[in-house]
Amino acid sequence: MKTIVIKLSGSLFSMDSGPSGIKKIVKTLDGLARNGVKVVAVAGGGKLARDIQKTARTFHADEALLDQFGIDVSRIHAKLLTTVSNKACPDIPTTLDEVLRYSTSHPIVFSGGLSPGQSTNATAALIAERTKAKLFINTTDVDGVFTSDPRKNKNAKLMKVISTKELLSKVVDDKMSAGTYDLMDLLSIKIIERSKIHTIVIKCDSRQIKSAISESELPMRKLVRKSTGTRILPLS
């Protein structure tokens, strides 16, 4: 049975966007499960986690505790997803071993973060590695990997393909403190690279998830300019 691991952007859980986006994505995942696909979806902490971490910093909380706040929020988000799905395991895993155990008996497992010092991107990449996932989809609040931040530069171009080496060079100077992980952090990229995980970066949207899965079966030479998101090539 094929396994797909999906990192769900924390932006999905913004209270401003309402529940419709969550419902559409969970419906898509339930549909995959009905078609015999195992799904592990890792929820991000998003704005709520960042706001809590920002407040805790004013009280001089250390980075490990800030990470734990982020993990706790992401697990609440994961639990929220279980209330929408009729295919998911009702329990939220707290270790990688629990993720693996739950996925043997349930077609869908929703997870939050697992360990302090590790982004939910890295958590999802580790799960993809351990489950030998056929596909890892990393969803963000933009359409994929761009030449620069598209929220700050209107001339930024979407990159259809990028190697892990190129991606590493883009993030190597990022500050690795709690709540600052954005597209991907160093650990998630190195996991993708070492295990040659088939990875696509897309916007957190149900239609894009469907498109990315269908396009993932296409060889690179058949990809067209309008294909969904960015493919990451695990090249060192």
Model region roles, listed by residue range:
Residues 1-236:
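C-terminal catalytic "cap/lid" subdomain
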